[in-house]
Amino acid sequence: MMNDEILRINGFEIVEDGFDQDKNKYYEGIFTQGNGYFHVRGSFEEGLADAPQNEVYTRTMKSVTTEQQRHPLSKQGTFLPLMMGKHPFLEEVIINLPYFMRIEIAAGNEKLDMIRSDIRDYRRVLNMKTGELTRSFTWITASGEEIDVKFSRFASLDEKRLFVQQADLKPRKGTPYITVKSGIDAGVTTNGYCHFTESSLFEKENKIGVTVKTDVGERASIMCENQLRGLDAVCHTELEKTTIDVIYEGALTENATLVKYSVLGCSRDRTEDYIKEMKECLEQTARLEYKQLLEKSKIIWEQKWKDSDVLVEGCQKLQDSLRFSIYHLLRCGGKEEERIQVCAKGFAGEAYYGRYFWDSEMYLLPFYLYTDPLSAKSLIGYRYWTLEGAKQNAQRYHCRGARYPWQSGLTGTEQCSMWEYADNEVHITADVAFGVMHYYFASGDEKFLFDKGAEILLETSRFWSERVDKGEDGEYHLLNVMGPDEYSPMTRDNGFTNYMVKFNLISALETLRLLKEKKPDRYREVMEKTNTLESELEIFKKIADSLVVPYDEKRKLYLQSADFEDYALIDMDSIWKDKKKAFGHYASQEKIYRSRCIKQADIIALMSIFPEKFTEEQLRVAYEYYKPLTTHDSSLSPAVH
């Protein structure tokens, strides 16, 4: 999957042998750590001198497939999914919080830097089974001294607020006079924009910390405590405008170890006093050794892997890819929080702005359903939490009911700035309904279905009853829609969308029938709360029975859309010079929109969801027809095929 000259997967370990500055930013995402409550990118503790984190620039609304983003050598990231801000162009975005992992080291006047320093025997390892990241190397200073350096760190699964680091320094040659600077940097930006309206740095007793106020009035705080052993050092604190550091200076005559305990919290936490909880957590955990805290976390990781690991025989590449994916899904899962989902980037960076897409229900939910049902319940519970936002979206389009946004944040209102996706990619609403039913079928959680799912299914069906158009043929149609294939933006009767809408409507009717039979009082409550009459349910049934799903009986072919074959067949190979890059880099959007080229699985995706509904012949015909036309420019596509 990702194996290259220096990066490989060995069992449960992601191993980097050697440093490549050109791939560093990419690797930072791969080495991301987290525990569901917060996540940190795999950036170096000491940073890179040539990669400032406070750059201000403008990022505008563009397609994420073809956008040429800025690519600094490093992009640090500290993310609390609950902390989102308001960007002037990009709407609601996740905020990159102050960088608290900073541990800078200098020997004399020479600062440790992976690019500028003489580094030997470099190795970085992420143990996916324990969540621990280690990095070791030998540093040859300009004056000829040699120091063995090892950094270790983990996000605790035992204490959700806790992140622990350890820096080990061992003199190999000479007696270098070293400076260790451990601190917090609040001078960071998110997509080139500063979301902090206030920043308060503080030092109290043996702790340092920062509280920032965001542009939407929420606050986030980080506190750190440092413990140094083995170095007879002079210690002082340095406070500047956006940074605070504890600085140790002394001659490195023996092995020295710095342990840094950090805790995070925010005003959106469901607690009366999150600052008090942070202090208590820091006081309790800072009494324990790094290894003790790691062992507590490892026990939980062990159980997670016991519930989730997949063994593959005969294909090591697939085995490695699965474990890599499972690791990141495990760190993202959250059993206790319905106000968030798992964002498209997995909280490993600023791309996709920390927002939630159809990926959640269609690609992520199945994993959690069969390995961590409580996280699955929270994932789909988010859609009930944001049901009011979905109703507001429908009202924007002069429709009743609930229209879930293509890109969703904390409020559940539409965050997508590009009209072709926001207006047309309406299948997300039916995907949410599918997620509700998938959770119910897998879990048997009738209480969730009746308490929350029924309202989601009813309100989404109500939206569809107003979004469809009745044609002269007497059938119902969905016009001007974009299915999963985002290279076909304004189609007529997209097969995936229409099939999913029929499922949405039928599921609503069946759920309400079951509710009326088993919980008549709750049935009346739902009908009254949503102002629904029995006659409206009859409309749902008519639409479900008559909504067109394009099918060519002669060829046994389900069409991606009724007008799919009106578009031009093009010689994709002659255009696509380098298939390591997206097809979208070689063809203009206008060219793509008028051609039969597919960004990602569409009809094939539908068939993978409902395999029992299609014959083997229909599956084969569709696969052979659509595969040559599919670019896989979306990472969601290959797995389906």
Regions found by a protein language model. Give the residues of each.
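Structural helix-adjacent loops and short alpha-helical linkers that scaffold large soluble proteins
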Residues: 312-319, 335-337, 370-380, 440-455, ...
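Carboxylate/His-rich catalytic cores and anion/metal-binding grooves
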Residues: 102-104, 111-117, 315-323, 360-405
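Well-ordered alpha-helical scaffold segments within catalytic/enzyme domains
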Residues: 306-311, 328-332, 362-373, 431-446, ...
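Active-site core of glycosidic bond-cleaving carbohydrate-active enzymes
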Residues: 357-385, 513, 529-640
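Helix-terminus loop motifs that line ligand-binding clefts
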Residues: 333-348, 374-434, 440, 447-450, ...
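Acidic/histidine-rich catalytic neighborhood
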Residues: 459, 463-532
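Solvent-exposed loop and edge beta-strand segments that line ligand/cofactor-binding
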Residues: 314, 348-358, 416-429, 486-498, ...
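Beta-sandwich/jelly-roll carbohydrate-recognition scaffolds of carbohydrate-active enzymes
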Residues: 2-322
